[in-house]
Amino acid sequence: MKKILAICGIELSLIFKKPQNYLIMFAAPLLLTFVFGSMLSGNDDKVRLAIVDQDDTILSQHYIRQLKAHDDMYVFENMSESKASEKLKQKKIAGIIVISRSFQTQLEKGKHPELIFRHGPELSEAPMVKQYAESALATLNIQVTAAKTASQTAGENWKAAYKTVFAKKHEDIVPAVTRQTLSDKKEGAEASDTASRAAGFSILFVMLTMMGAAGTILEARKNGVWSRLLTASVSRAEIGAGYVLSFFVIGWIQFGILLLSTHWLFGINWGNPAAVIVLVSLFLLTVVGIGLMIAANVRTPEQQLAFGNLFVIATCMVSGMYWPIDIEPKFMQSIAEFLPQKWAMSGLTEIIANGARVTDILGICGILLAFAAITFAAGLKALRA
């Protein structure tokens, strides 16, 4: 054990003796948290959109409520088409979503109604707005199909089944009573934009740091450090354990300091400490495993850093570390289901927003444990080869 701790201590000293590492480990994530958190926070920074409901039916009204239910980035306002067009000309709104007169009829026939989205050329967020609107429409389409199936089984009109099952969810009084009766948690709450970006950028930069740290295995092999350790009666298992422990400790030091810093600087409450410790520990084990896998398949520390950074940055984008995952296309959200960052982010959101404890995130912890087991096994096997 002393030999393992000695190797771990050496690796820690190598990481923290370089001043530039402090910038990438602490300064960069805190700065980006401040910038992105400020950009995404507050109504004044949200995209203001008008909704023109030409159909004025149960489903069109329910669709509007769905759009307004998740307004982290957008502010929706119902108005007439003439008023909306005038406001768009005056640039008082960024765009107009028009719900056509055949909206409910098309949904009843199992078809996908066409959404009309008008906006000015200066709206850079137009693709994201359209994707958000289409995503909400796809959800509504699924709900209508489910209500029609249920109505056939129960022998009642599909509208009655739909009102009973889905429309009631959006009545103000029902969620309030349910939450107070069943639990003292804020069911369905979402973390603030600053808290979400703090979690996302902490995950991103911890992964970047650990990818670079994993490259020290290659450097140690190249410089003959492993050979000298083996001749000094240190086993391969002890060497490997020392490096793995150092990566894990480095990750926790960085994550821990970021947690405390964001709490002091931005007032973020990270929730239940035990849940955070368990979740972050499992995620760090997964990242160590990924680092070992990449290190085993490249030849130089430079290649490790290049491939590692490319993997981390790309997968963090898909997993919603930079922005809310809800605004991404469906196929990207499906890909994110197979990435550990997405599950770590989901767990942290549950802890921060809903006050989740360890028992509440056992499913997420189980998924991260599976990720860790697979990546560790693959990485260690490749290193031995």
From Swiss-Prot:
The keyword Transmembrane applies. Signal peptide: none annotated. GO terms for cellular component: plasma membrane. It is found in: Cell membrane. Keywords: Cell membrane, Membrane, Transmembrane, Transmembrane helix, Transport. The keyword RNA-binding does not apply. Disulfide bonds: none annotated. Pfam families: ABC2_membrane_3. The chain crosses the membrane at residues 22-42, 198-218, 239-259, 274-294, 305-325, 360-380. Residues 163-382 form the ABC transmembrane type-2 domain. The complex is composed of two ATP-binding proteins (LnrL) and two transmembrane proteins (LnrM and LnrN). This is Linearmycin resistance permease protein LnrN. It comes from Bacillus subtilis (strain 168). The lineage of its organism: Bacteria, Bacillati, Bacillota, Bacilli, Bacillales.
